[in-house]
Regions:
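Short, structured patches in soluble enzyme cores that scaffold and shape functional sites
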Residues: 115-117, 147-149, 186-188, 196, ...
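C-terminal extensions
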Residues: 175-185, 229-235
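Single conserved hydrophobic/aromatic residue that forms the stacking wall/gate
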Residues: 234-243
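Short, charged/polar, Gly/Pro-enriched secondary-structure boundary elements
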Residues: 118-123, 163-165
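DNA-contacting surface of Y-family translesion DNA polymerases
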Residues: 10-12, 28, 72-75, 189, ...
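Residues that scaffold, gate, or flank divalent-cation-dependent active/transport sites
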Residues: 1-112, 117-119, 126-134, 143-147, ...
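Long, highly charged, low-complexity intrinsically disordered interaction regions
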Residues: 152-175
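Extended compositionally biased segments used for macromolecular assembly or nucleic-acid engagement
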Residues: 144-155, 172, 181-184
Length: 243
């Protein structure tokens, strides 16, 4: 009898402070500490990211820059640079080829690595994660890592600091996760909550045809990608270096 194929293992590298750190990568930790002037990254005159000290003043993401200056006279505003962020992700992806040939960009702050075949070479998942975190921190960036059996579950795990439950399927590992953390459309979450559905376990227990009728094909496809029922076609794993 053939042994059942082992599921692939995906590691998501999330860089929540990338918009700030691309300007001062070698001073990232200092810049985010509370002993420097408050710094905000703005786009179209709205705050998109805040340093630690800026956030401590009560400023929030989405605040208009003009209003922010009134609340914090010492605020330093820097225009967002999508090109710097893109180049930084490209550079980081190149460095990550040290650990796996399967590296892909996943949005503006994430990189996805398929690490199933890397575990033995790097003495297990914990050691591999440590090496990646050490490498990225040394480069001047603040990493958060999530690991799961699907790219989407790994991404969500990284963003919410979910413990590694990679030996379980996402439907089991994330079963207690609140719907608000699944990155579903807000109207869908509101409608589900009115039905008494607030966590992933309750959601996946509902008949698929009922969900499709109420929320549409796109909703079902997203849920199946999260759970691993279908492959994630939007994620391309290059066979040549990330450029």
């Amino acid at each position: 009898m053939r042994k059942k194929d082992q599921p692939k293992l995906w590691l998501c590298l999330y860089l929540p402070n990338l918009a700030l750190e691309v300007f001062y990568p070698s001073r990232a930790k200092q810049m985010l500490s509370d002993d420097l002037k408050p710094i905000a990254i703005i786009q179209q005159q709205r705050i998109e990211a805040l340093s630690y000290h800026a956030a401590a003043t009560g400023l929030t993401v989405g605040t208009m820059a003009s209003h922010a200056y009134a609340l914090c006279e010492t605020l330093i505003c820097i225009e967002k640079s999508a090109s710097k962020e893109h180049r930084a992700l490209e550079q980081i992806a190149q460095w990550l080829y040290e650990f796996t040939p399967n590296v892909s960009r996943y949005g503006d702050q994430h990189l996805i690595l398929e690490v199933s075949s890397s575990l033995k070479l790097f003495s297990g998942l914990n050691h591999l994660k440590h090496l990646i975190e050490e490498k990225i921190t040394h480069l001047g960036y603040t990493p958060k890592i999530g690991v799961s059996q699907t790219p989407l579950a790994a991404k969500i795990s990284a963003e919410i600091d979910c413990p590694d439950n990679h030996q379980q399927s996402p439907g089991v590992a994330l079963k207690a996760l609140q719907l608000i953390h699944l990155q579903l459309p807000s109207p869908s979450v509101t409608k589900l909550e009115k039905m008494g559905i607030t966590i992933l376990k309750q959601l996946i227990e509902l008949p698929r045809h009922t969900l499709k009728k109420r929320f549409g094909e796109t909703f079902i496809h997203y849920l199946e990608r999260l759970l691993g029922a279908v492959s994630y076609t939007h994620l391309t794993l290059p066979t040549t270096p990330y450029v």
